[in-house]
């Protein structure tokens, strides 16, 4: 293939990848964190290729063997093949085995955070030789990178379990390397190819021009990867085995939302209070109770004494008869535990968003190793800003409204029918 033909193909590929990356970013409600960064990296590659096309940059085959574009394509394809992608090109901080602060870029974070994917576009030959110490100075082998991923993942638990790591190879991986990764607990995706025994005449194994891939002569070694001998083709694991947390800690906002008349059909009103009218409109668009029920299903429910006490106090003041009845039923399903905030929760500095009650509730969930259900996203963000990340399930809030219905204006019947539950 001529250089100009290769250039044309690369430009087409870059344009297609930009469209796919933009579509990917739109595929999740609220977008995918890092989606804009991925698109901008692809656009930068396209811009560079177009400069070459316009004659502003001298055409070189090394430019066209763009490892950047190959890697970015691998990221897009990985994200397209996974469920619940929450971010791409996500940077995590961690402490290495020597106690030094490091950062790690995870190409795709999927399955709600439970899966970390490293997408690898380099060829199996190059990866294998780097692993054997035959790469260029400073090249880090895939196995060394895997150790970094494991170290970082242990420091970034999601719902109290470490993310599962997948290394996705888009230009194959040698069988010995794949075996080593599996032994380390890392899943491998891609073609696993054989490695031939020692060659008596390394010069027999010459690379075509299209296989140069920036590695140059480093591939002329005494062992070779046999790309044609594919031992296994491994797709992305359809189900990543994750120790799903079965404990749920209920915040006051969740207790209120769960029993609110608004969550049980009482959303067809215009209330005197603007915030209640807005919540009713949200409820007509998207019911919150089914989301709570689905998350709570088959899980053990907890609430700390402070949460239950304050919930009962709010009920006594604002709750209607139906809301109080539902509260009695709900409390019987819950194990009420003493307040026991975790040490890291107690280290939080008080602010407008971090008060002692929220600190106690979220901190008790942390001690229980439970996921805290809450509508208090402000506290979660404020704690995160102080470096404390709680395991949470965030939902929209619903206030106690049964006693307010008598003073509210019912919506016309045609509007009620259009948005009926």
Curated annotation (Swiss-Prot):
Signal peptide range: none
InterPro entries referenced in this protein's UniProt entry, alphabetically: DUF1308, DUF5614
Pfam families: DUF1308, DUF5614
Family named by the database record: Belongs to the UPF0415 family.
Protein name (database record): UPF0415 protein C7orf25 homolog
